Amino acid sequence: MLKLIWCQTLNGGISKNNKLPWYIKEELDHFYKTTKNHKIIMGKNTFDSLDQKPLNNRTNIIFSSIMQTPEDESYFVTNDFQQVLNDAKKEDIFIIGGKELFDIFLAYADVLIVSVLKDYYDCDLYMKVDYNNFNLDKQDVYDNFIVNYYSNKKEK
């Protein structure tokens, strides 16, 4: 399944200067537990925001046409959109950002996992998602955020 996962403010903010403007350990723990032992795909800017360090205990794939897979294969690089969709038919693949990648894959997503912070933060990049094509299946409530789980209506 193709799953998009992100965290946003109440008004859809997702970053400031290519960084998260918040640190909420409980939300990071949720992200880690959800994506652990799976393939994650991110854009080059998201990878750069992580100081080009792959995330532990996950297969890191960078969606880019200008990067190459390093010799040590600490991460992989692709720009094959169709291959990502084909692979997602066989296993869970998480798109973790950034916004351009979310925009590209949103229409093909089987599942959206959206953490919504219970506060506003200063952001310069915002998610604008039309949830009309998705069903809200479940919510997990935490002290500082709510996780909304959506499924694509076309999948039902």
UniProtKB/Swiss-Prot annotation:
Catalytic activity: (6S)-5,6,7,8-tetrahydrofolate + NADP(+) = 7,8-dihydrofolate + NADPH + H(+)
Domain DHFR stretches: 1-156
GO biological process, one term: tetrahydrofolate biosynthetic process
Keyword Transferase carried by entry: no
GO cellular component: cytosol
Record key words, sorted: NADP, One-carbon metabolism, Oxidoreductase
PROSITE patterns attached to this UniProt entry: DHFR_2
Listed EC numbers: 1.5.1.3
Pathway(s) annotated for this protein in UniProt: Cofactor biosynthesis; tetrahydrofolate biosynthesis; 5,6,7,8-tetrahydrofolate from 7,8-dihydrofolate: step 1/1
Keyword Nuclease: no
Single Gene Ontology MF annotation: NADP binding
Class in the EC hierarchy, top level: oxidoreductase
Classification via PANTHER family: DIHYDROFOLATE REDUCTASE (PTHR48069:SF3)
Family: Belongs to the dihydrofolate reductase family.
Function text: Key enzyme in folate metabolism. Catalyzes an essential reaction for de novo glycine and purine synthesis, and for DNA precursor synthesis.
Protein name according to UniProt: Dihydrofolate reductase
Species of the source: Ureaplasma parvum serovar 3 (strain ATCC 700970)
Encoding gene (name): folA
